[in-house]
Design a protein with these regions (language model features):
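Flexible interdomain linker/hinge and immediately adjacent N-terminus
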Residues: 104-137
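Non-catalytic DNA-binding core/recognition domains of DNA-processing enzymes
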Residues: 16-107, 199
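Basic, Lys/Arg- and aromatic-enriched nucleic-acid-binding interface segment
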Residues: 131-162
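Short, basic (Lys/Arg/His-rich) helix/loop patches that form interaction surfaces
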Residues: 249-297
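Conserved hydrophobic/aromatic "anchor" residues
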Residues: 13, 33-34, 99, 210-213, ...
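Basic, alpha-helical nucleic-acid-contacting "clamp/cap" segments
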Residues: 176, 185-266
């Protein structure tokens, strides 16, 4: 285990990504190089504690230069530390971008400036997303994919903000999941407005699959009416006087940060989503909202 909190947070992120074996080896290479760069005091001090600071351009610039020079190799090659190959350099850059995207940060073209944020999807892309979700429903899905599929389907119907989605409860669903009640909280403040929204066949099916998974999880956690719940045991992040945290079982309410994280991780994990989803859930919400306004006129 690394002595640096930022690298320990990176380890957790890598586990959450669920990358394939080949990609995980590449990501582990980057993880090792970043840890060695920190041990050399080659990166900003803030990068030791914060994963976000570790993945900012201020830290990644010197890291990439050191790594490409061969200084961060974990073993010598013919007695020396030669520069890494161009193929390895390209893999490193791709891994860095993947890690940044998993945190909701824009990709970087290191040495060539930032790549702008991916624009909000157009109506055609939203339709393609719905078709992709429908394909998921036709096959077997993990609990995480089942939850994300239901979340995205609800988003396509409601254009709800992440906070509005996070507080949904099972009693906010109509009979046979034919409608969902959502309370709008305007970003600039103002009166809260609630409305019932008719759901699509896609959303009804996706919610049905998720509710079956959710039922078993909630029973083990002694029950909650929140629609979105955690899939695995975790901790509440608060230290007691002895430096310990409270363990939370699976089936506990998923807070807004957890919901957003599930979106970011799922976007990278499941086939077809990276090309269809923007970096942030809020960008998807705006696209859905714009599409709803177009069809209403």
């Amino acid at each position: 285990m690394s002595k640096f909190p930022s690298v320990r947070a990176l380890d957790q992120l890598l586990d959450d990504l669920g990358a394939g074996a080949a990609r995980r080896r590449q990501l582990d290479m980057v993880r090792g190089e970043l840890n060695r760069a920190l041990e050399r005091d080659a990166l900003p001090v803030g990068a030791r504690r914060s994963l976000r600071r570790l993945l900012e351009e201020e830290a990644l610039g010197p890291y990439v230069r050191l790594a490409e020079s061969g200084t961060l190799r974990h073993r010598r090659v013919e007695g020396g530390l030669p520069p890494t190959s161009e193929a390895t350099n390209e893999i490193r850059r791709r891994c860095v971008d993947l890690l940044r995207e998993a945190l909701g940060m824009p990709a970087l073209r290191l040495g060539g400036g930032e790549i702008p944020l991916q624009p909000a999807p157009e109506a055609g892309t939203l339709s393609a997303l719905a078709r992709q979700l429908d394909q998921y429903l036709a096959g077997a899905m993990s609990p995480a994919q089942t939850r994300l599929t239901a979340l995205l389907a609800v988003e396509l119907d409601t254009a709800g903000r992440s906070g509005e989605l996070a507080v949904l409860r099972t009693n906010d669903l109509g009979k046979d999941n034919a409608a969902v009640y959502i309370e709008r909280h305007p970003q600039g403040g103002g009166a809260v407005e609630g409305e019932w929204i008719e759901t699509s066949a896609l959303t009804r099916a996706a919610l049905g699959r998720w509710l079956d998974v959710r039922k078993d999880l909630v029973q083990r956690a002694h029950g909650t009416t929140r629609l979105w719940v955690s899939l695995w045991m975790n901790h509440d992040g608060v230290l007691d006087d002895d430096g310990h945290t409270t363990i939370r079982p699976a089936g506990m309410p998923l807070e807004e940060n957890g919901l957003v994280t599930s979106y970011r991780v799922g976007r990278l994990r499941y086939d077809g989503l990276r090309q269809l989803l923007p970096l942030k859930l809020e960008q998807l919400r705006r696209a859905v909202d714009a599409d709803r306004q177009r069809t209403a006129t």
